[in-house]
Amino acid sequence: MKAGIHPEYKAVNATCSCGNSFVFNSTLDKDSIHLDVCDKCHPFYTGKQRIVDTGGRVDRFNKRFGALSSGKK
């Protein structure tokens, strides 16, 4: 490998919104990152049903134009 062309590989601390934190190795410039969900609080892994989606463009579109596409032709 050529010297000086590869990014630095270092430990990064990840903190989830549920309070869980863990360390992983990465080439990120940051020392820590914040996650919305992790394996301790994600509904797929916990088996609990809760809405994870924070909304977006599709939801806004459906709110505005959902009545128009209600199946009437």
Curated annotation (Swiss-Prot):
Q: Which SUPFAM superfamilies match?
A: L28p-like (SSF143800)
Note whether rRNA-binding occurs among the keywords: yes
Which sites bind Zn(2+)?
16, 18, 38, 41
Q: Which cofactor does it need?
A: Zn(2+)
Q: What is a biological process (GO) this protein takes part in?
A: translation
Q: Which GO terms describe its cellular component?
A: ribonucleoprotein complex; ribosome
Give the keywords, sorted.
Answer: Metal-binding, Ribonucleoprotein, Ribosomal protein, RNA-binding, rRNA-binding, Zinc
**Domain of life of the native organism:** Bacteria
Q: Which Pfam families match?
A: Ribosomal_L31
Question: How cofactor binds (record note)?
Answer: Binds 1 zinc ion per subunit.
| GO molecular function, a single term | rRNA binding
Q: Does the keyword Transmembrane helix apply?
A: no
Q: How does it assemble?
A: Part of the 50S ribosomal subunit.
Please name the HAMAP family in this protein's record: Ribosomal_bL31_1
Its biological purpose is as follows: Binds the 23S rRNA.
Question: Which family, according to the similarity comment?
Answer: Belongs to the bacterial ribosomal protein bL31 family. Type A subfamily.
The protein in question is named Large ribosomal subunit protein bL31
What's the gene?
rpmE
